[in-house]
Amino acid sequence: MKKETNVKRTGCYIRRNRFILGAAAGLLLAAALPFGALGAEKGWQMVDGAERYVDETGGIVTEQWKKRDGKSYYLDENGEIAADAWIQGTWHVDETGAMEKETWIYEDGSSQMAKGWYYLGPSGKAEKNDWKKLGDVRYSFDSQGRMRTGWHYENGDIYYLGDENQGYIQIGWRYLESDGRKRPAEGSVSKALVPGEPGGQWYYFNSSGKARRAEVGSYKESEIDGHRYYFDANGVMATGWRCVREQAKPGDGTGISRFVYLGGKDEGMLKSQWLETEERPWDSPEWEQA
């Protein structure tokens, strides 16, 4: 009986200690839980001196977008609001941390982004690898979202997008610095020269920004404002005597009918009247090629 009594008393003692230990464990568990797990309100809270977002479990939200007062904010790896920064190379937040939309951002090259202009669309995403009409002009953006400038080649077409203060398609006649013998490099900027200034060439860009150009080894005839012009494969307006036809006219044993005279450097128009000129077809570098 005494043993049985001890067993009962021991059993009673264990049950009491189970209760005591359970309560202590509960206190320890509460201390180990994330901030707010035991009743903290979900939403924006001041935690450790910074404004953070607490989820329904009481955890601090990290690397996510959260809204407040209609604006989106990005919470970094510490749960703090990112400010004046690029997010994943696609979005940009201002000094307050709010996502920016429908605005231009200029980078000077000191950040993760290359130097140049970027445009953030209605969703806040940077325009990338596409054309975008803003106002009355069209811009082109590369795969990183940077506004293209200078010469741009796409699907066989030639565009000129101006300098970093322009970046939009050029339309109409442009007299640009170029030797005319080869295409300028992608993205290179050509200085706009005064007509007649040495070192320049004439180009014509249509309403879509595409340069009038021919296939390699030939010339393209184009009528502009009632006048006929010829352009080579690089988009350069042809001048002087040029061999523009593959075959001479019947009865022409010299091949001179393959040539046309297009005037001086700043003319380029096809001449269809009698002219007195010191330039002769056989002085053209194309005469031997013909």
Q: Language-model features: where?
A:
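Extracellular adhesion/carbohydrate-binding repeat motifs centered on closely spaced tryptophans
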Residues: 2-290
